[in-house]
Structure formats: structure tokens, C-alpha cells
Amino acid sequence: MKLSFDLPVIQINKKEELSTLRERFEFCLIETYNTYDLFSSKTQILESVKACVEEELNDVSKSEIEEIWNLYIARNNKIIEILEELKEESVYGGNRFRTQAYGKAISAIKNVRVPIISGSQAQKLKGVGSKIAKKIDEILETGELRSLVQKPDEVRKRIDVLREFGAIWGVGPKTAVRLYDAGYRNIDDIPDKALNSKQKIGLTYYKNLQERIPRKQITLFEKDVRKILNELGNLKMCICGSYRRGLPDSGDIDLLLAYEGSRVPQNYFKRILKVLHEKGILIEDLSQGAEIYSGIMKTRDGIARRIDIHFVPKREWGSQTLYFTGSKEFNIDLRNLAIRQNRKLSDKGLFDEKGNRLPLSTEKEILEALGLPYIKPQNRTDLSKWS
């Protein structure tokens, strides 16, 4: 087996050793999969490959091996990128079954934390069928799919327009196609009468909602909201996502709330939302349920931003903050670790092999139950240091 499409240039101490190291790495990766599979941990696979490489090349450093590892992992991302494009085509083409097939395959591959080396190997994942496996082989061999490369320009332009329309909050594939078929070709063409009330909100704030939110804006928002909620009393709050992980910006704001008293007062979540509206924090409602709210908030400098507010049970605080903090890769690693222990981890909690929820209410308790130390949010990239 040869994984033949070109890897990017990588830095090795001696340039002439590049080809030898890469070939040895590839041989060892294939050999390792005779013992391990795609469900194994990154640490297991990487350590096995490293030991195999060192049998022939003694002066190779761990960092050099990890650098090549990351390039092979990038192939997984290339597979996902191309399958996402195929899924997008099927969505706008109205092919529901093909959309579902690509969606399942993409989800399965996203859960893999080690390099995929063939379509037949990927087919062992639930959701990857024989047709998609053949496409994966072509991607691994060439770095592309001929069917996409040869796509006519008019088809590409149509997809670009549909993608822009689909970025409007509340506009799904069917609405995007309807707008396109009505003759509209950009955001400015769309009249109010072509959209429902929620979609009009999405269009009104389209530009702001496409922008990343600077950390400073969220920090000021957190200060303002905490002051308001403290007046209500008995409320615990946490802004999760990339903000809690210490990153410089975020796509939207995920605010988690929990009532700390023994019994939640009737309609308490509605009261909270009403107060946030009265204080000028929330300016538009997009959707609202018993425990989840989606809307538009306004920053101190008057910029509209997307916000989701989750009102969670006190006993789920640990699992909910763990889930909504991320990162996505960290959550995948945690779920896979739980599966290897015959358990299930979700935003609702950690469950044993019989489906019983374990009485764990903090992140620390959940992580320790999985055999891990408490991991600070800013270190939650993946579990490679701990698995």
C-alpha cells in the first residue's frame, strides 16, 4: 500500500533523511494497524510507530516523528473537507439519502484521532460504506476527487451563492434554493417579503454574525451579565466554548446557567430572559425552549452577536460545562475513553455499562472517574498527554 499524494515539506535535521524517514514512518504505520485499529488511542498508535521507526533509524527525535504524524493526520482533514463538499452538493441538490450517507461518514471520521490509510480501513467505521471508501482511496492517492475538480464553473458559482444564502440564520437548504431559483444572486438582492420573521433577523445582522467575537467583548459582557444575575440570586453561570479555553475570539457565546437552590421556581428561566431583555442585553429572540434559548445580544459598543443560553439541572453542571467548553477533539477523546471503559459520556453525565448515571456533579469528579486528573480548560486540546 502506498499513500502517494504529496505531503507538505517538513523540517528534518538532515534533508537527505527526509525520504527515508517518511518511508519508514509509513511502513511502521501500516504495520502498527496489524495490531491496533482506528478505535485505538493516539498514544498507543504513536508510541508503536515510534518504536518501529527507531528499530531502523536510531537518531530520529520524537518531535520529527510527531511532525510527520501531524501531516498524516492532515489527510484525515482533507478527507473530511472533500466529503463536506460532496455533502453540501447533495444538500442543495435535494438528495436526502446521499446527504445522510455523507453526514454519517463525516461524523465517523471526525471521531478518529489516528491517521486513516485506506478506504477499506475507513469502511470499518460505522457509517462509511463501499462507495465512500472508494472515494477515500482516491483522495489518499491523489489529494483530490476528479469529480469535484472537473465540476463546471456554473455549478461552482451556484454552490457559492447557495452557501452565502445558507449562512443567513434560519435559512436552510430548501430556502436557499428557493431564493436562488427566484433569481437572487447575493444577499443585497433578497427582499424582506422573501423571508420569514426569524430569517429577517438573520439578514439584518448578517455581517455582525459572520464576524468572530473578540475576547474583550465577551469579558465585558460576562461582567455585565454576572452583575445582573447576582441580583436574582441562587444562580451559577459560566461562559464556555473557546472563551473559557482562553482563546482570543469566539464564533458565538455559550452561556450556561444553573439554579443552586433545592427547587427551581416556576418559569424561572423565562424570568431570567425577561430581565436580560429589560437590561438591553438581549435584543432579538431566535428560538426559545424550556432549557435552551438562542438569540441576538448587544455588546457594550452596540455590536450584535449570537448567543445561546442553556439553563441546566444542577446535577448536570459538571458534564454540561465539560461538553460546552470543548474543544471538539478533547470531547471526542473523552467519549472514546469512556467507551473503552464500557461507559458512556454525554452532556447529561457519565453512565455505567448498565446505563445508570453516576452521581458526579463537577468536571473534576467526572475526569477522575475516567482515570484522569483535573485538566484546566486552557489545556483541553486533546488527551494525548494523559492517555
Please place each PLM-identified region on the residue numbering:
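Non-Sec secretion/translocation targeting segments of pathogen effectors
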Residues: M1-F5
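Amphipathic alpha-helical segments in structured regions that serve as interaction surfaces
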Residues: K14, R22-T32, K42-E56, E64-I68
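Amphipathic alpha-helical segments that form the core helices of the histone-fold
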Residues: F25-C28, T32-N34, V49-C52, A101-K110, ...
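Charged, low-complexity interaction regions
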Residues: T35-S40, L57-D59, G93
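Accessory alpha-helical DNA-binding modules that contact the DNA backbone or grooves
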Residues: V53, W69, R96-G251, L257-Q288, ...
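Patatin-like phospholipase
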Residues: E67-G93
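An acidic, glycine-/histidine-flanked metal-binding catalytic module
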Residues: P265, E284-S387
